[in-house]
């Protein structure tokens, strides 16, 4: 594993660090929005006094704190999309790979990074037993995951049930409802709500001090002005899902296909919302990372 000098120095000097995934760059957003957004999110973190650490794998080397040149090289290498279980394959076979939520969490934990910002977590897909590694990894890795809930292409109720089954601590940030990506808030209640980054830091500290393993999932809704109605998203979703099944797309290829197709069908509306919720999550992650340091 290679930890960049900037990230290594920040960790040694007690400067707040947040992890960022590379899948959003390689498979989550179309070019050139992917590269532009990745750069913008890193700049946001730096402006808030936090060092960003984009995580990915380049020709078999795990890199924590990818440079722009390394990101470009990874993209040019047609990277795999990997979860935790595929990390050994990518490393052993010297492949380039973009890390999903699960893989990014595991690598962040190994590197000593406590906070990770993403768009939305994976979960239980509609109509079958396709369950994301994100959930099982959250049962193991002691990392704060800031996300806009789960993606609306999933079975939200079953995803919430699986999070409970795997004993993942979930808190809503300034909300009592579980958020669902572009659509804002779902109808599903959350048991626990917090209203400050400091409270999130307190919960995480308590979790670690008690030796209770696993992530703290912070459900942070998309800002209201960028919410897209359930009815509108459902229309795009039904068409995209139908095309997905017709094309025989399965597994990890499903989510990037659906997100890309829905962006096309919405004339870029979902793309704008996706970028805004990422910015919102990075900002909160920065506040949490700083709160953890002031408590230390």
UniProtKB/Swiss-Prot annotation:
Keyword Zinc in the entry? The reply is no
Q: Give any single GO term for biological process.
A: nucleobase catabolic process
Task: Identify which cofactors the protein needs according to its UniProt entry.
Answer: Mn(2+)
Report which reactions are catalysed by this protein: D-ribose 5-phosphate + uracil = psi-UMP + H2O
Q: Which GO terms describe its molecular function?
A: hydrolase activity, acting on glycosyl bonds; metal ion binding; pseudouridylate synthase activity
Give the residue spans that cross the bilayer. none
Please provide one cellular component term from the Gene Ontology annotations of this protein: cytoplasm
EC number(s) on file = 4.2.1.70
Keywords per UniProt: Glycosidase, Hydrolase, Lyase, Manganese, Metal-binding
Q: What class of enzyme is it?
A: lyase
Cofactor binding note from Swiss-Prot or TrEMBL: Binds 1 Mn(2+) ion per subunit.
Residues bound to Mn(2+) are 130
UniProt keyword Lipid biosynthesis present: no
Q: Which residues bind substrate?
A: 81, 101, 132-134
Q: Where is the active site?
A: 21, 151
Role according to the record: Catalyzes the reversible cleavage of pseudouridine 5'-phosphate (PsiMP) to ribose 5-phosphate and uracil. Functions biologically in the cleavage direction, as part of a pseudouridine degradation pathway.
The subunit field of the Swiss-Prot or TrEMBL record says: Homotrimer.
The record's family statement is:
Belongs to the pseudouridine-5'-phosphate glycosidase family.
The name this protein goes by in its record: Pseudouridine-5'-phosphate glycosidase
What organism is the protein native to? Fervidobacterium nodosum (strain ATCC 35602 / DSM 5306 / Rt17-B1)
């Amino acid at each position: 594993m290679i930890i960049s000098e900037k990230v290594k120095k920040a960790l040694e000097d007690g400067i707040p660090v947040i992890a960022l995934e590379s899948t959003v760059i390689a498979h989550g957003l179309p070019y050139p929005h992917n590269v532009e957004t990745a750069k913008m999110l890193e700049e946001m973190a730096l402006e808030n006094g936090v060092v960003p650490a984009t995580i990915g794998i380049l020709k078999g080397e795990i890199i924590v704190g990818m440079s722009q040149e390394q990101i470009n090289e990874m993209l040019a290498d047609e990277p795999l999309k990997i979860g935790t279980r595929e990390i050994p394959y990518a490393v052993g076979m010297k492949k380039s790979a973009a890390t999903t939520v699960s893989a990014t969490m595991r690598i962040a934990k190994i590197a000593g990074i406590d906070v990770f910002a993403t768009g939305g977590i994976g979960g239980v897909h509609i109509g079958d037993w396709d369950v994301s590694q994100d959930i099982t990894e959250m049962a193991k890795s002691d990392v704060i995951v800031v996300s806009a809930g789960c993606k609306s292409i999933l079975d939200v109720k079953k995803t919430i049930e699986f999070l409970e089954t795997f004993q993942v601590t979930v808190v809503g940030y300034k909300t009592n409802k579980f958020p669902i990506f572009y659509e804002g808030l779902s109808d599903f209640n959350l048991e626990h709500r917090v209203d400050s980054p400091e409270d999130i830091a307190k919960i995480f500290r308590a979790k670690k001090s008690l030796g209770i393993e696993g992530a703290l999932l912070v459900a942070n809704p998309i800002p209201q002005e960028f919410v897209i109605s359930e009815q509108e998203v459902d229309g795009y979703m039904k068409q995209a899902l139908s095309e997905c099944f017709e094309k025989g797309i399965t597994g990890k290829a499903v989510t990037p296909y659906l997100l890309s197709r829905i962006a096309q069908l919405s004339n870029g509306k979902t793309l704008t919302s996706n970028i805004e919720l990422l910015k919102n999550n990075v900002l909160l992650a920065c506040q949490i990372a700083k709160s953890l340091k002031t408590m230390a």
